[in-house]
Amino acid sequence: MYVDDAGGARVGPAVFDQPRTLELGADLGATGLDKYGTVGPRLGLLAGDTALVASIRARAFEFGLEARPMLYPAALRSLAGYRPERVRVLVETTRRVGQAMSAVFGARLHVTPVTAQLRADDLLALAMERAGLATPPIVPIEATAALAMLLLEDYGVLTVHFAGMPPGTSSLLLKFIPPETLERFGGADALAKAVDSSVDRLAALLRDRAALTALLLGEVTSSPARATAPIGS
């Protein structure tokens, strides 16, 4: 049995006192090293039955998917420096951000034990309310993408949606926030205020199709017919 445990390989034991992946009886378990208490590099880590790992490693080399040897020392340092306490600190920091966001967005903020989320449907509805619109000019995930662009443009906040790595959700997802990063930003209240201000800017842009198109797609240089096509098409 193979388990792709992703960040849960650390979050489960550290936060919820759950068994480690291989303690569940799995033959193989995989996780990544780029988040949730580890510091990179961004590669996969496979562990388990020695013979199975060797076979999979050989096939990875055949496909050119293996981790480059130059990354081994960085991976080793990341593993050696991992502490479950760090994961709990990240969760606590996220909880404080969630509290600050709840004070601004109320019931529209969706909170889980380890995340705070502005769901795309709620985000678009909120922006439309602030803009006084009854008909959405974009689809929900475009609202999240636009908010991500605005947060980066105005506050230097880099989110998954801007970076172009397909997330598992259309929500604006806040999780496992380093306290050092939050402190440099000015604290949880400052971050919540930044998101709120960016939602205000998003609301204004909903009434300006050209500006919204430029925000999401850059300056459109194609034919006029293509340039005026609906954003959500």
Where do the PLM segments sit?
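Short alpha-helix boundary/capping motifs
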Residues: 11, 91, 141-142
